[in-house]
């Protein structure tokens, strides 16, 4: 399935709207996400996993397994540096993924994993992620078809033109992607 990440949730303060889609598939072993982005400005300062990738040109996937109280966040900048964790909320009971768990997430990006300051111009880029399902389902084997509650995001907090896009609308006064109450639902066949 292909989804458009096109909700500009805070248009008065952050009207920027790059073109963003994400294609989602699974092979019963892993979830595959292929983000396609076209927009102005490109930034990739963070090169290490579990660093502030959201400040760069970044795509994100937050998901919640049915019946779970918490959710997971996967955030990846345009050069493949990632943040990943399980959590109850933005700041509550955060359990960052270990280096081994992060290493199991396959990443393919348009740009090599080399830092660069913000560049002006029009850029098209992709990030492809392959996330093992046993990581998402915390060691349990999912039964297919399987539903996931989730949202897809695009952000770039520290660029000249910050933006905060989502697939599902977020009805909050300030940018915050850590809000499972606004997740939509996808089905893994």
Positions of the model-derived regions?
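Structural preference for beta-rich elements and adjacent junctions enriched in aromatics
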Residues: 1-189
């Amino acid at each position: 399935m292909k989804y458009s990440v096109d909700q500009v949730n805070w248009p008065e303060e952050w009207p920027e709207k790059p073109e963003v889609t994400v294609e989602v598939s699974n092979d019963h072993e892993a979830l595959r996400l292929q983000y396609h982005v076209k927009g102005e400005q490109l930034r990739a300062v963070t090169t290490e996993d579990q660093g502030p990738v959201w400040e760069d040109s970044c795509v994100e996937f937050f998901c919640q397994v049915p019946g779970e109280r918490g959710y997971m966040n996967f955030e990846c900048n345009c050069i493949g540096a990632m943040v990943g964790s399980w959590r109850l909320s933005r700041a509550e009971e955060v359990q960052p993924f270990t280096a081994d768990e992060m290493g199991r997430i396959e990443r393919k990006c348009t740009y090599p994993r080399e830092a660069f300051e913000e560049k002006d111009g029009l850029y098209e880029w992709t990030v492809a992620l392959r996330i093992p399902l046993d990581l998402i389902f915390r060691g349990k084997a999912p039964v297919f078809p399987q539903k996931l509650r989730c949202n897809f995001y695009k952000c770039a907090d520290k660029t000249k033109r910050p933006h905060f896009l989502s697939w599902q609308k977020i009805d909050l006064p300030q940018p915050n992607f850590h809000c499972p109450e606004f997740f939509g639902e996808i089905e893994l066949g």
